[in-house]
């Protein structure tokens, strides 16, 4: 089967569609597998769910705000241990957890010692994705670093468990070019493709709308993926608005394998 999930227009639930063919997703019936909370966390702005199969279980990573702090967007995790995520039962694992420092080191802040690392998921965080490479699993997400100006960067970390990071965040990409800074300085919506000896990460840039476009990062498959120097960024968008082709504001893609075995 092909499985499909996406932001629901009412921002209040997560649904899954299932089809034997990729074209069949369009008209496939959808099943609601989770609904937002009435109060507290996970109560508003249910955004950008992604479905992943990890170590024999299914997981959905999504972003959500609180009922009274709707823009306190953070990543959360759902888990399904059944074979079919469309038919199976889903459970909340709660928020995605940052790496916990094992002990206090000289010069380390009290905040870092008493809790999780003081950087990951402390501000507006969303659009999480995950991938495995050579026995290690990685987590990539978008997070704002300046509360007032709101620069959205991409970060990467190794994972300890499906709902917890093993390392502190590493800056993967920040809006460097003019085409990443239209109306808002944004890098978000990462998607990963392993192909031809490379690790590719596509991402979305600028404000949503006609100016929304897509950039691309790449690293050699033998590189240390937590080393920022291992990654290179294309200087120009790989997809952008093209009225002649009736393409407007492309962004936040995914990759899959088509019915004919080709990468889509």
Predicted regions and their residues:
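Carbohydrate-active catalytic/glycan-binding domains of CAZyme proteins
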Residues: 1-264
